Design a protein with these regions (language model features):
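Sequence/structural signature of beta-propeller domains
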Residues: 1-206
Length: 206
């Protein structure tokens, strides 16, 4: 994994080795590292990077790593419902959000956002070998306005409301779409967010 300080040097920034982790170097194929997230500076893993595999399974569960300097620490996320992980980001309070996607010829496509509490995602918690799980913030299927949701980012409105942005990849296929979805995670709804619009509803253009 290489790191470059674009803020200081722009696109001419020299890249430097962030970690030489043997587990990451040995990952092959198209189900490798899919999500990279930066924890808040004041969180348990501030100053590190978190990398999670799309479908790197260990004992049937997803694998992720906390990368800090030349050190890496592996952790596990419980795999539920045949979903793969496509992205991740952190809320300001240190909770880890996981974007998951499922595609099945029988069940169709679905997307899910899970929230893993900062109280569980700690060096002490990972040292016990615990399997992280978390709460479902949102689950949607093809009855809603979704597609191949692969990207997620979190920003914060001036009033402090976390905004979750999701984007899909159409893979240059005529039967897929590029969608940008936005959700407000309000305090009174912190345990759940409503799913996207119904699929039968026409989206506005512009």
């Amino acid at each position: 994994v290489r790191s470059a300080d674009l803020a200081k040097h722009g696109f001419l920034a020299p890249a430097s080795i962030l970690t030489e982790s043997a587990p990451l170097n040995s990952i092959k194929g198209n189900r490798g590292i899919e999500a990279i997230a930066v924890p808040p500076d004041d969180s348990a893993f501030g100053g590190s990077l978190v990398a999670i595999g799309e479908r790197i399974l260990l004992g049937g569960n997803h694998s992720g790593w906390v990368l800090s300097g030349n050190q890496s620490r592996r952790f596990k996320i419980r795999r539920r419902g045949d979903f793969d992980i496509t992205d991740a980001d952190f809320l300001p309070n240190g909770d880890l959000l996981i974007l998951e996607r499922r595609f099945s010829l029988i069940l169709g496509s679905a997307v899910r956002i899970r929230r893993i509490s900062a109280a569980d995602f700690t060096p002490e918690g990972l040292a016990t070998g615990m399997i992280l799980d978390g709460l479902d913030l949102m689950t949607a299927d093809l009855t809603h306005q979704i597609d191949n949701m692969e990207g997620m980012a979190v920003r914060v409105d001036p009033d402090g409301t976390p905004i979750i942005l999701l984007i899909s990849d159409d893979n240059m296929n005529f039967f897929q779409r590029t969608l940008l979805l936005e959700f407000a995670l309000r305090p009174e709804e912190f345990g759940v967010i409503p799913p996207p619009r119904p699929a039968a509803e026409t989206l506005p253009r512009g």
